Amino acid sequence: MKLTTMIKTAVAVVAMAAIATFAAPVALAAYPITGKLGSELTMTDTVGQVVLGWKVSDLKSSTAVIPGYPVAGQVWEATATVNAIRGSVTPAVSQFNARTADGINYRVLWQAAGPDTISGATIPQGEQSTGKIYFDVTGPSPTIVAMNNGMEDLLIWEP
C-alpha cells in the first residue's frame, strides 16, 4: 500500500470520528426539556434526523363530550400543536399526560376522535397540526402537561 493511500485513509477515519463525535450531542438531548405552557419545545428523534416542535397551551377543565368513552372523572383539555421542523413527523399523541404538582398522572385519551382533536396523521416537513388533547381527571386538578415515551419524560410544560 502506498504511503499517500495510507495517509488519505487515516485522515478519512479521523474525519469520520470527528463528525460522529460532534453530531452525537444533537441526537442525544438531555431530557426532559422543560418550558412554560404555551411555549414551543423542540426535540430531535433518537437518530437525529427528524426535528419537531410541540406547543401545549390552555390546560383547563372541559365541557367536551368524548363519544364512546365512559368518563370516570372530569374531562380536561389542552391545545397542542406539532411542528415538523426537519423531516416528516408522525405525532405521538399517545405519549401525553396531564400531571399534578405532586406527580399524579392522567393519561391522554388518545383514542378520542373528533373535529377538534389533534390528528395522529404524518405531517410533512414545514407543516404543522393543531388540535385538542383530552384527559380523564379522576383526582386533583393537573397543572402540568408532560410527554413521556414510557421510559422517561421528554417534554414538560409547567405554569
Curated annotation (Swiss-Prot):
Gene3D superfamilies: 2.60.40.1240
Keywords for the protein's UniProt record, in alphabetical order: Secreted, Signal
Keyword Secreted in record: yes
Compartments it resides in: Secreted
Transferase found in the keyword field: no
Coiled coil region boundaries: none
GO cellular component: extracellular region; extracellular space; peptidoglycan-based cell wall
Residue intervals passing through the bilayer: none
UniProt main location, coarse: secreted
N-terminal signal peptide: 1-29
Protein's recorded name: Immunogenic protein MPT63
